[in-house]
Amino acid sequence: FRSKNADLVGYYDTNAAAAEEAAAFTQTAGFDQVQQLVRESDILFITTPDSLLVPVWEEIKGMSHRNQIICHCSGALSSDSFSGAKEAGVSCCSVHPMLPFSNKFSSYQQLEHAFFTVEGHPHAVQVITDLLTSYGNEVCRIDAAAKPEYHAAASILSNQVIAVLDTGYR
C-alpha cells in the first residue's frame, strides 16, 4: 500500500519492536496501544495467524467506530469470525492473496501482481475490491463457506510453484 501512496496510519503489535520496525520500513507510526490505531483508521487490516483472529477481534470490537472496515488478511478463516460486527457498526471481510510471504521486507514487492480473493460484508468487499483493482490487482469474490478449501488449495499451489521455480534455478 505504501508503494501505491496509500494513506497509511501505522502498525500495532504486541511486540512493540515489531510495530516500530514495520512503521520505520513504511514511514508510518508505530503504536504502543491498539486503541490509538483503531481510533485513527478507517480501514483496519488484521494480519494475525488464524489462531489469534477471534481474540484480537474480541479485543478491538468495542473500540471500532461506525462505518469502519475490518479486514483480516486471512488463512482459512472467513469473515464469519467477526461475531457482533453488525452491532458494532462495522463491515468486515477477509482478503487472501495468492502469494507466499517468505520475507517481510521483500515479499510486498510481489503484491503488485498478486491475485486476491475477498469475501464478507458486501460494503467491505466492495471497498477492498475497489482498492485492490485500483492498484492493478485482479480480485475474485468467493463465498465464506469456500474459504477453508480455497486456503488449502492456495497454500499447496503457491508452495508448489516455489518448489518448481527452485528446481528450475538449480
Stretches found by the model and what they are:
Residues 10, 30-32, 141:
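A structural preference for short, hydrophobic beta-strand core positions in alpha/beta folds
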Residues 9-13, 70-73, 116-119:
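Short, hydrophobic beta-strand segments that form beta-sheet elements in well-ordered domains
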Residues 30, 34-106:
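Rossmann-like NAD(P)(H) cofactor-binding subdomain of soluble oxidoreductases
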Residues 3-26:
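NAD(P)-binding Rossmann-fold cofactor-contacting core
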Residues 18, 22-25, 89, 106-170:
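Internal alpha-helical scaffold of NAD(P)-dependent oxidoreductase catalytic cores
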Residues 15, 74-77, 99, 122, ...:
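Glycine-rich beta-alpha junction loops
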Residues 2-3, 35:
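Hydrophobic, well-ordered beta-alpha structural blocks that scaffold small-molecule cofactor pockets
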Residues 4-5, 25-27, 66, 87-90, ...:
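Short, structured coil segments at secondary-structure junctions
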